[in-house]
Amino acid sequence: MAPTLSAPVTLAGGTDGDAGVTDATLMGQDIVPRKGMYAFRNSLVDCFTLCDLSTIADYAAIGAFALSESMMGIFASPSGDTINNALGTRISAGLDTPWFWYILGDWTYWYDAFNGVSRLSNPSMFGIGIVGNLSPQQNPLNKPLQGVSATQRSTAGQTYSDTELSLVNTGGIDTVKPPQQSPGGYYFSFASGRNSSSNTAANGIEYTRMTNFLIRTAKSKAAGSFIGRLQSIQPNDQTRQQAKALFDGFSAQLASPMVGLGLNGQGMIDTPWSVVCDLTNNPPALQALGYLFLYWQVRYLNVVRYFVVKFMGGGNVTVNVQNTPPAPQQLANPINVAA
């Protein structure tokens, strides 16, 4: 019998299926059958969140899991949270890892056009969304967040002071800035693009994602094809030469602007890179134990966080070319703005 399409059917009394779902349910178990977060084990997922999980005591386990699986956990503090409270939470939870992105609970509004209402949601959903649309060398800093119509603070007419943004940038957290404070245009954007690590060489989101991307590459099927092959102590051993050629070739592709999606004429890594796979790191004693070692070093592209313009003007100014480059010691702690 054909369905009746002439009149709309109104559904009522349904549920969203979240009855009985707790933070413990979201965390799950790491035994077979794996459940919750642990269902992601060996799934090659790039980033994940556990929707609206609020148990601070779980954060350390989440960070450890993300590190072990080469993933990045993306979470936000409770709705309406303050910067100082979020900073305290990060410290009390023992969060100091590149594999955890912690966003302030200045929750985001988005317009549900189908139902004609604005909905308030955890900002981690926009964190997941933006990194899912960026190649791993890109940082979400100052990237337009499509779909965000407001945040709790912007609705109340509250902007972030320079002091507050400095705390965000140096405290291992992030937040969503309103359009009037995004440096590149009139849109909502993330303020720091930093993970929860205190290591300044590793606290950018691009560090986490590029590192995870390259680690997964090193564990790819192409690299795995060397398992079971033979290796000799001869200087011209083909197994080692082919392993080096594989990683040299891949590095060359990463450095190519074409592979970097043509962004600003850049690739995904900087040059030069280094690949070592010879007798210097594969002596006979290690070969006898079944090991093949390859040392791979790459330099990531650096994110522009501070655009500093040194200006002098006036009718009595003598124009000279400055040949002395600035030193990092000259600069105070900036906050990701063009100045």
Regions from the PLM with identified roles:
Residues 290, 294-325:
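Extended amphipathic alpha-helical segments with heptad-repeat/coiled-coil character used for oligomerization
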Residues 1-243, 252-281, 287, 295, ...:
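A glycine- and small-residue-enriched flexible loop/hinge signal that marks low-structured segments
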Residues 55, 282, 301-305:
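Generic "edge-of-domain/loop-turn" microfeature
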